[in-house]
């Protein structure tokens, strides 16, 4: 894949990548698929090789979904905390694979776990990124009733990122589920307001609202296609941009 050699030619120089837990399990029903995680790590390395500063927020849905557990009777706050622990497992797994490729990586958790990763401290996270280390944010926001999408938006804003890249199972935002509706319309660009008004399920409303308030653009794309992250950051490939 041909890369842009001059970082100054790129509009976005500091990015946050949101990776769902489901993306890490590949074709499995649960857990991790190593080859899939390795491909994601290789894709991230391509972005680093462009000279960008990279942060990541990872979900935990491949291991545990707090909202689903709450639906069957578990206390929602307790279920969400378990889900946060799942994101730490995923972050450590991704870190291990990335470091095997020579990528300097740090995991910072919103829930302190001193034996396995660093606690989230904003200044420390920014310093890691300045040193070209990839920072993986785990533990969501550290609070129940908040999604990892909300955590991704908050961390992107705190790190002064230029854009949030949301890696999904489809190649952008549609007016309905393209897996169920073959005639679903895809948007190349769409406003925050239209995402909220049309109840599009790309992110929860709170996350979109915070992104809008802070003018953080969001680019939605498919993580299934190898090399897609670097293409998308260079305005190539298939994606949808959410902005004002």
UniProtKB/Swiss-Prot annotation:
Stated name of the protein: Uridylate kinase
Kinase is among the record's keywords: yes
Quaternary structure and interacting proteins, as annotated: Homohexamer.
Superkingdom, taxonomy of origin: Bacteria
EC number: 2.7.4.22
Binding residue positions for UMP: 60, 80, 141-148
GO cellular component term of the entry, any: cytoplasm
Residue positions binding ATP: 18-21, 61, 65, 168-169, 174, 177
HAMAP family, per the entry: PyrH_B
Gene3D superfamilies on file: Acetylglutamate kinase-like (3.40.1160.10)
PANTHER family the record matches: URIDYLATE KINASE, URIDYLATE KINASE PUMPKIN, CHLOROPLASTIC
Keywords: ATP-binding, Cytoplasm, Kinase, Nucleotide-binding, Pyrimidine biosynthesis, Transferase
Regulation: Inhibited by UTP.
Known catalytic reactions: UMP + ATP = UDP + ADP
UniProt main location, coarse: cytoplasm
An annotated Gene Ontology molecular function: UMP kinase activity
Subcellular location: Cytoplasm
């Amino acid at each position: 894949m041909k890369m842009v050699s001059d970082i100054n030619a790129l509009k976005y120089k500091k990015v946050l990548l949101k990776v769902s837990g489901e993306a890490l399990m590949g074709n499995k029903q649960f857990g991790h698929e190593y080859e899939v995680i390795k491909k994601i790590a290789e894709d991230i390395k391509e972005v680093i090789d462009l000279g960008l500063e990279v942060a990541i927020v990872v979900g935990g849905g491949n291991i545990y979904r707090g909202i689903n557990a709450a639906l069957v009777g578990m206390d929602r706050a307790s279920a969400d905390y378990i889900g946060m622990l799942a994101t730490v497992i995923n972050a450590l797994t991704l870190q291990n694979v990335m470091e095997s490729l020579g990528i300097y990586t740090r995991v910072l958790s919103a829930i302190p776990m001193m034996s396995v990763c660093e606690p989230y401290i904003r200044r420390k996270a920014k310093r890691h990124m300045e040193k070209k280390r990839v920072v993986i944010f785990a533990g969501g926001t550290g609070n129940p009733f908040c999604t990892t999408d909300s955590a991704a938006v908050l961390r992107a804003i705190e790190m002064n990122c230029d854009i949030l890249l949301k890696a999904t199972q489809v190649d952008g935002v549609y007016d309905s589920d393209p897996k169920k509706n073959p005639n679903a319309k895809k948007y190349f660009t769409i406003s925050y307001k239209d995402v909220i008004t049309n109840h599009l399920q790309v992110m929860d409303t709170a996350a979109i609202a915070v992104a809008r308030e802070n003018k953080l653009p969001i680019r939605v794309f498919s993580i299934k296609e190898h090399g897609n992250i670097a293409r998308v950051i260079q305005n190539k490939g298939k994606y949808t941009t959410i902005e004002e």
